[in-house]
Amino acid sequence: MTEDNEVQIAGMSIVIVCSVVDPASQNIKEHLLKLRDWVEMSVPGGIFDDLSAVYQSGNFYIIEVTEHHIYQDGIDRKIEEAGLDCDLLIFASKHKSADGRRLLTAHFTGNPGSADFGGYPGELSMAAPFALRCLLRNMAELSESIGFDVSMESTHHGPSDLDVPSVYAEIGSSEVEWVDQDAGDIVARSILSVRSGFCPVGIGFGGGHYAARQSELVLGSDISFGHNFPNYQLQFVDVDMFRKAVERSGADLVYCDRKAMSSDEKKRINELADEFGLDVLRESDIKGMEGVCWDIFRIFWHKVRDEGLSGRVKVPVGLKDKLSENVCDIFDFDVSNVVTVVIDNELLKLVRSVDAGGVKRLLDMSNVVYSERDDATISNHFYTFWNRDAEDFLTFIVDECIKILKGRYDTEYVFEENVLYISDERFSPELARKWGVPSGPMFGELAKGQSVMIEGNTVLPEMVHERTQKSLVLRNVIF
């Protein structure tokens, strides 16, 4: 994410563009005028061809035009020429669809393919991901009681020739909703609540126009999205369009709606992401990094992959405060600072055989980052930035694993030798046969500790069990 895409809080000027010919835009404008004290102002003539009015209230401006918003290419330059400050453009508009959904939306503009509704072919506007995040979250919070859905839309229509960060805020999807007073009030309040800030920014690929999974991530995780390309636009995403999306979004990562995309398309997008040095994160990865500084999460992400491991990077809740944005502001971490703890894999396998979820529960109480494979098993590599935490974790995990094993086996850990001795009583089919027990149900009864009768003789469980012992050298290491 770059400062070209998101502006600093101090001195941020927001220009709201409203259209006379758009009923939803007029609805939003009327509520904006009610919510703050505005002063109508004049600007030099000859700059705007379709100017209706200009209002100012603090750091907010309303510019009302007589034409549709989608044809306002270059309006950022006109605003500058008129002597107005503009760090962010918000287009207050209607959303139209045949299904007539009660819907509040936000999206960016541009034309990955042809320019059928304003803008230019193959051109993307400068996106404002944090503003989109603010809008959608404000809309969702304020609209809970009025029956409107909230969604991010994929990139579409004009204007595309905009170098100031911009975003659309819309009411949909029919004449009834466009003039709905509650909807107008909510969108107006959402616009006035927009602030600047920084968060990880993804560019999205796949799925439908309304980007359901991407919308969910904006509303429920720590990231936002820049430009988004649904399935019907993927054909236009070549190297040049991918580069534009990265640059015009300030992208940190790539997200694919994997279930909605073909294998070939996923492979192609992954290759483009590699070419531009961007990570492709899954939904679970994005949700898992909640509360963790993006730069720190990315360090662990790459550490896991540099060691040839796969799966999701998991950060226990108790560790997140130590890896938050505040820590990023204080320390300058990189991958060379990562301390790796390797726990003996046989120990973890043995614990898993006794208690399938035991290791996971221990890790959720721990102070290290770990990797969970796609089959939900845990890698034996664990990570932290602090040597003391690594040493404490090694002691903790070994002690707790032994406690779990003691619930099933007789165990003895010899610290000086770093050896774990494990003893077990096991049913022996061979001994059972020697006592005349045939294979079948009686084997099961004896294995469960129950006696059986053979030709009038009682065969006790202890007669057909044998004691085994094995030693496990714990190959644990910190480096």
UniProtKB/Swiss-Prot annotation:
Its EC number is 3.1.1.96. Keywords: Hydrolase, Metal-binding, Zinc. GO terms for biological process: D-amino acid catabolic process. The keyword Aminoacyl-tRNA synthetase does not apply. Pfam families: tRNA_deacylase. InterPro entries: Deacylase_DtdA_archaea (IPR018033), DtdA (IPR007508). Its cofactor is Zn(2+). Disulfide bonds: none annotated. GO terms for molecular function: D-aminoacyl-tRNA deacylase activity; zinc ion binding. It is an enzyme of class 3 (hydrolase). Binds 2 Zn(2+) ions per subunit. It catalyses: a D-aminoacyl-tRNA + H2O = a tRNA + a D-alpha-amino acid + H(+); glycyl-tRNA(Ala) + H2O = tRNA(Ala) + glycine + H(+). Belongs to the DtdA deacylase family. D-aminoacyl-tRNA deacylase with broad substrate specificity. By recycling D-aminoacyl-tRNA to D-amino acids and free tRNA molecules, this enzyme counteracts the toxicity associated with the formation of D-aminoacyl-tRNA entities in vivo. Monomer. This is D-aminoacyl-tRNA deacylase. It comes from Methanococcoides burtonii (strain DSM 6242 / NBRC 107633 / OCM 468 / ACE-M). The lineage of its organism: Archaea, Methanobacteriati, Methanobacteriota, Stenosarchaea group, Methanomicrobia.
